[in-house]
Regions:
Chain A
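Conserved N-terminal structural module of periplasmic/extracytoplasmic solute-binding proteins
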Residues: 2-110, 295, 310-312, 334-335, ...
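Extracytoplasmic/periplasmic substrate-recognition and gating elements
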Residues: 63, 67, 169, 248-255, ...
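Extracytoplasmic "Venus flytrap"/periplasmic binding protein-like
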Residues: 63-135, 140, 167-176, 270-271, ...
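Hinge/lid segment of periplasmic solute-binding proteins
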Residues: 105-157, 214, 298, 303-304, ...
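Long, aromatic- and glycine/proline-rich binding clefts that accommodate carbohydrate-like moieties
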Residues: 136-139, 304-305, 353-401
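Extracytoplasmic/periplasmic solute-binding protein
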Residues: 148-152, 157, 182-232, 277
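Conserved C-terminal helix/tail region of periplasmic/extracytoplasmic solute-binding proteins
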Residues: 167-168, 190, 382-434
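Glycine-centered hinge/linker elements that transmit conformational signals in sensory
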Residues: 185-186, 229-260, 306
Length: 434, 328
């Protein structure tokens, strides 16, 4: 009884908060757009996520912004990813929301699809360097033709590998096709297989972002737009071929990773740090995590783009990242727009690139070149894609992800390929099809 | 205490009308004060219950008839949709599967908890003081460990690669358990979760029942011994009547707690694999917190309350019918 009532009390508290603070939106957007830019006044509250932009960047940005707009104070707050959706929901429902927010790209549609939650930024696209937006991110911030999210930054996965092990196994060049990749795994196993702890490729059963690459590479997709809704296409031939290749990687490599967990349980970087893993599919900043266990790994590690089934090409990759948005009931939309304008300028975008991520509003990726892992990621990012911009996509990721269940069921042999894909397709349709 | 006690009447004289009147008034006022005072004293508690329990309950009920997604939450619009949340929930066959699973799961772990607690309580009566204290300290430790900490320990015990259980079974000769996944099916996952919940619930039940057992006077056991009663007969005739009311109460409490169990289920496999260990509490979380569909979640919460009221109705009936909480 008590626990139930706690839940009830929590739900009611949210309602009370809304009931008390509703109805204060939409009146103060008109001030900015007549002729000469009106002077901006008041404070602007900015919420960026932890780890998004280095402090040197934001310090300089906030300083420049305040210098350009005397009298405006930037209230800069760093947020944690854990529980951010609830925190944003509560903040947006409150009377004084932050003026600039960062939203994960897979969550943007959930906020954008509800009218009156985010400010429509379609008319301002050009002032945010709209010509150079990263396509995969721009798609995730657009809902029914209107722009609600401005690309901030993105990152995508690549194959991180041990150069020294490749050399010892006699692999002279990094794989450029799926066949060469499988071939490399076999060679590595022949060379190091006598060590029972060795894994040629660390591949947990639920690394579904990697599965997306394989599905897209085989011409499939997880869902297709169907009018205003989405229709799951996990039972398509392309999706099945992607799954089959995933299983081939798992089986050939003989990975000891759990089949019912993703790359975060346990953190694959820590496993890689143990020194018995020749490859993993990960993000560039997982290397520093691994190097905490074994600093010598930094020099021994390289990266190559996820190969395609077509020799010489690379597979499309899932673009993970963030968009910037302005809540509809922000009290200072004009200042918020100026702030995003400054952040999307080439000066700060190149600093983002130098910090190791793909900038959202600039095609200049030279900042990533000095880092071997970053440059590989930058090249692959041009072939980046996003998950379906369905308002319900948040349900898929924060709840029980049917794609993960499908992977585990198929890899463990509990379901056949046809059964696993059919079940997952039905489950996905239930979540995003309605 | 009463106002009438010390009133003396002048003998042989007709008492004047006026003092009598005032006396009567006084008496009435005194009675009124006596009658009101308990309620006044109850008022703070009542206010707290109204604000913290009743009002949220009414709110949840109201929300369950509304469409309340993130859009409505931010814009503050109230959209009434009648029974849509209920019909949508009840027409989903998955909901009935989950309800059935939750009921079976609750019944199984409540039975295991009560049985385990009862056995341990009876055992403790027969133990020497030193061993008993060791058992009691162990129980308190199991009880006092935070839920998530115990859950993490259980996750490691049952881990397919590095878990101590699989390693031990392998050493004992059951080599099939190398790399065996305890979380590959819903039933197996729920068994592990059930064991975990029972593990944490048994100490409370044991201590409650043991308190009942030590309330039985030693003479009764001695008398049973002289009559030549067996252990089972002693339990039936002496122990059981003494602890029956407490058993009823802890069963009732266990039903409430286990039916709503969430933290352990979510922490182990988030209701997986493939939704196989999803209970009503998990559905509630998925709808409300993960999916931001507060209206639909409120409907599920209301339905859960109704189910709970149905299965605990018998106890509440006993509670209201008997005096002084005598539930035997």
């Amino acid at each position: 009884m008590k626990r139930w009532l706690k839940l009830a009390a929590g739900a009611a508290a949210v309602t009370l908060a809304t009931a008390g603070c509703a109805g204060s939106s939409g009146t103060d957007t008109a001030a900015s757009s007549s002729g000469a830019p009106a002077p901006i006044t008041g404070d602007v509250t900015v919420w960026l996520m932890t780890g998004s932009a280095p402090a040197t960047l934001t310090d300089a940005l906030n300083k420049e912004f305040e210098a350009a707009h005397p009298g405006v104070k930037v209230k800069y707050e760093i947020q944690q990813w854990d529980g951010i959706q609830q925190k944003l929901t509560t903040a947006l429902a409150g009377g004084t929301p932050p003026d600039v927010i960062e939203i994960g790209n897979t969550q943007t549609a959930a906020f954008a699809s509800n009218e009156g939650v985010l400010t429509d930024l379609t008319a301002d696209k050009d002032s945010f360097n709209g010509a150079q937006w990263l396509k995969g991110l721009a798609d995730s911030g657009t809902y029914e033709g209107k722009v609600y999210g401005v690309p901030f930054y993105a990152a995508n996965r690549e194959v991180i590998y041990r150069k020294d092990m490749f050399e010892q196994a006699g692999i002279t060049k990094t794989p450029t096709s799926n066949d060469e990749w499988i071939d490399a795994i076999t060679k590595l196993k022949t060379k190091f297989g006598s060590d029972p702890d060795f894994q040629a490729l660390y591949m947990p059963g639920q690394n579904w972002y990697s599965l997306l690459s394989f599905i897209w590479d085989n011409g499939g997709d997880i869902a297709q737009p169907d009018g205003k809704k989405f229709k799951a296409t996990l039972d398509s031939a392309g999706a099945k071929a992607g799954l089959e290749f995933y299983k081939k990687l798992v089986d050939t490599s003989g990975t000891k990773a759990p089949k019912d967990a993703d790359e975060a349980k346990p953190q694959q970087a820590t496993v890689y740090g143990g020194g018995k893993v020749a490859m993993m599919i990960g993000l560039p900043w997982e290397l520093p995590t691994a190097a905490k266990t074994d600093p010598s790994l930094t020099a021994k590690t390289g990266a190559f783009a996820i190969p395609s089934k077509t020799a010489g090409q690379t597979a499309p990759v899932f673009l993970g990242g963030s968009n910037l948005a302005i809540p509809a009931n922000s009290k200072n939309v004009a200042a918020a727009k100026e702030y995003i304008k400054l952040l999307s300028s080439p000066k700060y975008q190149s600093q983002l690139a130098a910090a190791g991520v793909v900038p959202g509003t600039s095609t200049d990726l030279t900042g990533l070149d000095k880092d071997p892992l970053g440059s590989v990621m930058a090249k692959a990012s041009t072939n980046g894609k996003a998950v379906p911009a369905s308002p319900q996509w948040g349900d898929v990721e924060s709840g029980q992800n049917p794609v993960k269940d499908m992977l585990t069921a198929y890899l463990t042999g509990k379901k056949t390929l046809d059964q696993a894909t059919a079940d997952a397709n039905a489950a996905l349709n239930k979540l995003i099809g309605g | 205490m009463t106002a009438t006690a010390n009133v003396t009447m002048p003998a042989g004289a007709t008492p004047p009308a006026s003092p009598r009147d005032t006396r009567a008034k006084k008496r009435r006022r005194g009675r009124f004060g006596d009658r009101v005072l308990p309620y006044l004293l109850l008022l703070p508690a009542l206010a707290a219950i109204l604000v913290l329990l009743a009002w949220p309950l009414v709110q949840v009920l109201a929300i369950s008839f509304r469409k309340l997604d993130i859009g409505q939450l931010v814009s503050g619009k109230t959209v009434w949709i009648g029974f849509d949340n209920y019909t949508n929930t009840l027409s989903d066959p998955e909901f009935w599967t989950v309800t059935f699973r939750t009921l079976v799961f609750t019944a199984a772990i409540v039975a295991a908890t009560i049985l385990g607690g009862l056995l341990l309580a009876v055992l403790m009566r027969h133990l020497g003081p030193v061993v008993r204290i060791i058992v009691q300290v162990t129980l308190v430790l199991a009880w006092a460990t935070p839920v998530i900490a115990t859950t993490t320990v259980f996750q490691w015990i049952f881990d397919e690669q590095y878990g101590i259980l699989n390693k031990t079974l392998d050493r004992l000769g059951f080599h099939g358990f190398i790399g065996f996944s305890w979380f590959s099916s819903g039933a197996s996952t729920l068994s592990v979760i059930g064991l975990l919940i029972v593990w944490q619930a048994v100490p409370f039940v044991t201590f409650s029942l043991y308190a009942g057992i030590i309330g039985v006077s030693r003479e009764q056991y001695e008398a049973a011994g002289i009559d030549g009663a067996s252990a089972w007969q002693t339990f039936r005739a002496v122990t059981w009547p003494a602890i029956k009311p407490i058993t009823t109460m802890v069963t009732f409490l266990s039903v409430l707690w286990d039916f709503n169990a969430f933290a352990q289920i979510w922490a182990i496999r988030e209701g997986g694999p493939d939704g196989g260990s999803t209970t009503l509490a998990v559905v509630l979380y998925l709808k409300g917190i993960a999916g931001n569909h507060f209206g639909a979640a409120a409907a599920i919460a209301t339905l859960m309350l109704i189910v709970l009221a149905l299965i605990t109705g018998r106890y509440i009936q006993l509670l209201t019918r008997t005096r002084e909480g005598d539930l035997s």
